[in-house]
Amino acid sequence: MAGEDYSFTVFSKNAFYAELNARLVDLADVKSDLRVLDLACATGGVTRLILERINRTRDTVVIALDHSQTALKTAMEELRDISNNAVQYVQGGVENVSEVVRDSVDTVVFCNAIHYLPDKDKVIGDISKAIKPGGKFAFNTSFYEGGQHEDSAAFYNKWMFKAFRILRKEYNLKPVRSEKVESRRQLSPEEYGDLLERNGLKILKQKVDTVQVPIEGWLDISTFSDFIEGTMPGVPMDKASAALQEGIKQTYAELSVTHVPRNWLDIVAVKV
């Protein structure tokens, strides 16, 4: 099966995903920054977007940080045509950014991962320490209170109903709801604002980016471990993924749709 390692890589290759991240980088306005950190950079898709927009000087540094050595090696290969010695690859987790990145940065970009942080206050506080006064923290997420577009309620309800029925019928399994952890709770935009303010950051720009997601996007997100575990906690990964994918196919066919809208929350905050 494509995405059998259950990583985010398969989903991240979707064209619409690159486009929505490009809009976040544009919103952050990094062109005059000297030091930019791409947090949880994975294979370098967002790092490339930053490199394409930044005005390079001798002192320009784009830091690509990820916990996975394999992802960083792939990023090095993927960015070879554009990096031109401006990229610094750093292996480390998002939990200790200020220790790993010793010199403060102008901007931190953190795409589609903030919702997975178990202790958001701790991590955002540490990110804030790594940013220069007046510097920016830009992030986006589709997993927030408001991510489900109002026109897609029927799609989600039908998809989940079908996926759970397939799981029960084909595998005699059901999710273990007690295993759904607090970090999976989706914050509202207001709660994100409070989170930022508690950690010395103030919202500068905020917008909702509505994206038309094709069937491939939903099939691919159904191969990503964090999404699978959040949707079907306690179910073996392969069976949960198969049920979600078959549910998607049946739902798209039944509704006769080609795309389903999904909202992404884009926020750029400034360190005060």
Model-derived features with residue positions:
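Class I SAM-dependent methyltransferase Rossmann-like catalytic core
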Residues: 2-18
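C-terminal helical/coil "lid" or tail adjacent to the Rossmann-like core of SAM-dependent
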Residues: 3, 204-258
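Conserved alpha-helix/loop element of class I SAM-dependent methyltransferases that forms part
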Residues: 15-32, 49-52
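Class I SAM-dependent methyltransferase SAM/SAH-binding core
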Residues: 35-97
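A short SAM/SAH-binding and catalytic strip from SAM-dependent methyltransferases
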Residues: 106-120, 143
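A short glycine-rich, Lys/Arg-flanked "PGG" loop and its adjoining helix->strand segment in the class I
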Residues: 121-133
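Conserved class I S-adenosyl-L-methionine
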Residues: 138-169
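Short alpha-helix
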Residues: 184-199
